[in-house]
Amino acid sequence: MIVLGIDPGYALMGWGVVESEGSRMKLINYGCIETKAGVPMQNRLRTLQLGVKDLLNIYRPDDVAFEELFFARNVTTALMVGAARGAAIIAAAEYTENLYEYTPMQIKQAITGYGKADKKQIQQMVKLLLKMDEIPKPDDAADAIACAITHCQAGVAKTQFLMK
């Protein structure tokens, strides 16, 4: 199974492609789709949407896993990231119905065994689980890889994480 993990973002949208076979996982590729500040919102969203479409066409994932948004304070940031997430979901929905979402706590629990793990712990475990030489950068890409790993580990229970 090939999974595209996405960490929604407006300036940087992290992505990671992980292939799993049984309990074995292999990192295929990762990176970020970047939008430039000062560009009109609709153009930035279009860049994100087209970027996700390109990833889907290149890697042909079986499933797409999104990290759910969690913002406690900044409403403006939440709205912008929500719009970016929407652009990515629309692109993915045109490709497949197999869209899943995981909360940050579920990802932390799956990756480290502790639902309140910090970023460094998650990054270190991503490196370990995928036998990488170094921690993936930037953080957005590492988060997307962690989301893909979480989905791979969900196994038959993954249906409970289908987007509704």
Label every model-predicted segment.
Residues 1-164:
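Phosphate- and other anionic-substrate recognition elements at nucleic-acid/protein interfaces
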